[in-house]
Amino acid sequence: MACPYRSSAYTNGDHAQKGEVLGSEMGMLYGEYLMLNQIINSQRMQSVVSNRPVHDEHLFIITHQAYELWFKQIIYELDSIRDLFNTITVDESRTLDILKRLNRIVMILKLLVDHIPILETMTPLDFMDFRGYLSPASGFQSLQFRLLENKLGVKQEHRVKYNQKYQDVFGDDAKSLDMLTASEDEPSLCDLVQKWLERTPGLEESGFNFYQKFRSNVYELLDREEQKAKMQPLEHIRNYQLMDIKKRRDVYHTIFNEDAHEALVSRGERKFSYKAMQGAILITLYRDEPRFSQPHQLLNCLMDIDSFMTKWRYNHVMMVQRMIGSQQLGTGGSSGYQYLRSTLSDRYKVSLDLFNLSTFLIPRSNIPPLTEEMSNQLNTNTRTIKPTN
């Protein structure tokens, strides 16, 4: 008896199992679709060209080509995310798409961090065998990495200068210079996220007026703690507690006073606008509300991107120190290890303010309670966050 579930699809599968392979008349083949001939044959070992082949040069080329392909994918995802953000109102139904693509960037960066140990299977002596062929080539000349940084939100004024402007390494390459200029002039992901945060529901002074309530609760909390500290019988403990409370007042002053906030921005110690900081704090404190759940995850993704970028920079720095030490110049003329180490500073973190939000958190019992109107607003699946007046 014939199997009732047997279909033509299974019959065709039997032909394939017997060795009958579909021809190109059915469409593009695997290698054609992926253009593997161009990719697989794009490794040109300079040591081979010089008739002194060095085995590990092949690994070096493959790894860096893989980096560049992943950089291209990150830029592709970044551009699509920026397009979704770059509107007068952000369609909240697309937040899941933004989250998915941000998570994809995070996973790619995690993979890139794991590439470093593969390169480290090459010893410093192995690297020395072909390092001379690299000059004046340098990772500093990676156009895509510079575009990636610019599109994320690394500002030119925050970059570490090693001996020239970062654009200068591209010389007379007009196309590359135009792409760099465009990436600097266009709104970065950091810029667009700030605009989005500035429109967070609940910041309206004519509505919930979160920030005024938050300010009042913070100072009431500090006043109570100060009164309690003054009752401490032991002088050294009392003085320590009062000093700590004063420091906390000073820190909170920087988020409640716009001039104090702008002073930190001018020094590069804070990146977000005054209103964007308010939105980020609001989302963080009320992250359990349905409407703020995905925005809170989005903010976490931005921190994850910064974290993995920093981990990648750190692993890269340690690998460079291991390969060439801390005194030699890089192949492109940079200070090598010294320059790379300087890029680990907070000035390269585009979401620095999100990392520092925990400084301003208060106990749940002191978080301003939602009004009925605000509670309804945060439990409603609204499609767009409309800009406030």
UniProtKB/Swiss-Prot annotation:
Belongs to the tryptophan 2,3-dioxygenase family. Keywords: Dioxygenase, Heme, Iron, Metal-binding, Oxidoreductase, Tryptophan catabolism. Its cofactor is heme. Heme-dependent dioxygenase that catalyzes the oxidative cleavage of the L-tryptophan (L-Trp) pyrrole ring and converts L-tryptophan to N-formyl-L-kynurenine. Catalyzes the oxidative cleavage of the indole moiety. It comes from Mayetiola destructor. This is Tryptophan 2,3-dioxygenase. Substrate binds at F60, I61, I62, T63, H64, R131, T331. GO terms for biological process: L-tryptophan catabolic process to acetyl-CoA; L-tryptophan catabolic process to kynurenine; ommochrome biosynthetic process. Pathway: Amino-acid degradation; L-tryptophan degradation via kynurenine pathway; L-kynurenine from L-tryptophan: step 1/2; Pigment biosynthesis; ommochrome biosynthesis. Homotetramer. Dimer of dimers. PANTHER family: TRYPTOPHAN 2,3-DIOXYGENASE (PTHR10138:SF0). Heme binds at H316. Pfam families: Trp_dioxygenase. The keyword NAD does not apply. GO terms for molecular function: heme binding; metal ion binding; tryptophan 2,3-dioxygenase activity. The lineage of its organism: Eukaryota, Metazoa, Ecdysozoa, Arthropoda, Hexapoda. The keyword Metal-binding applies. It comes from the Eukaryota. Its EC number is 1.13.11.11. It catalyses: L-tryptophan + O2 = N-formyl-L-kynurenine. Binds 1 heme group per subunit.
